């Protein structure tokens, strides 16, 4: 079927693509095997190799699973851009859970929606943002609150 925008489409590009069958976690694991000592993250002059990144993600994923996170569970991720955000994101994926990204500028009233709408029970955040998330959780009925923050 010819869509209206296809008449402007470059001839060398296909109209559709088939996404790869590998997950983001698989891509990280493959990179960690191929390039264990290569830099994966560089942040304020500190470097984390692919092997170190994978190990940190595996540890946090195991922690999430020990808290009861199961396949398909939603986990809030409320952080500024930093290596811990990347580690937490991949760890949630490794635990077969779903990442629910949260804008760190949100306040308690807005955060309540992030907790209740996806039915999240676990959140990963930093100390500077934990107060707002805790206030949001505490303002909810007991059955809707976060179990782990």
Where are the predicted features?
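Flexible, non-catalytic linker and terminal segments flanking ANL/adenylate-forming cores
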Residues: 1-21
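Conserved AMP-binding/adenylate-forming core of the ANL superfamily
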Residues: 16-21, 29, 37-82, 86-90, ...
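Residue-level signal for pocket-adjacent positions within structured domains
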Residues: 4, 8, 36, 74, ...
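Structural core segment of the AMP-binding/adenylate-forming
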Residues: 66-67, 94-149
């Amino acid at each position: 079927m010819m869509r209206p925008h296809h008449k402007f489409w470059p001839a060398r590009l296909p109209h559709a693509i088939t996404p790869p069958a590998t997950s983001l976690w698989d891509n990280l694991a493959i990179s960690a095997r191929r390039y264990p000592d290569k830099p994966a993250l560089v942040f304020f002059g500190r470097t984390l190799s692919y092997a170190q990144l994978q190990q940190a993600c595996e540890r946090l994923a195991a922690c999430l699973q020990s808290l009861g996170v199961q396949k398909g569970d939603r986990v809030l991720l409320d952080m500024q851009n930093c290596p811990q955000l990347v580690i937490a994101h991949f760890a949630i994926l490794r635990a077969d859970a779903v990442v629910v990204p949260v804008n760190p500028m949100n306040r308690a009233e807005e955060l309540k929606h992030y907790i209740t709408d996806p039915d999240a029970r676990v959140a990963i955040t930093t100390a500077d943002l934990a107060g707002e998330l805790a206030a949001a959780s505490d303002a909810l009925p007991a059955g809707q609150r976060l179990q782990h923050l």
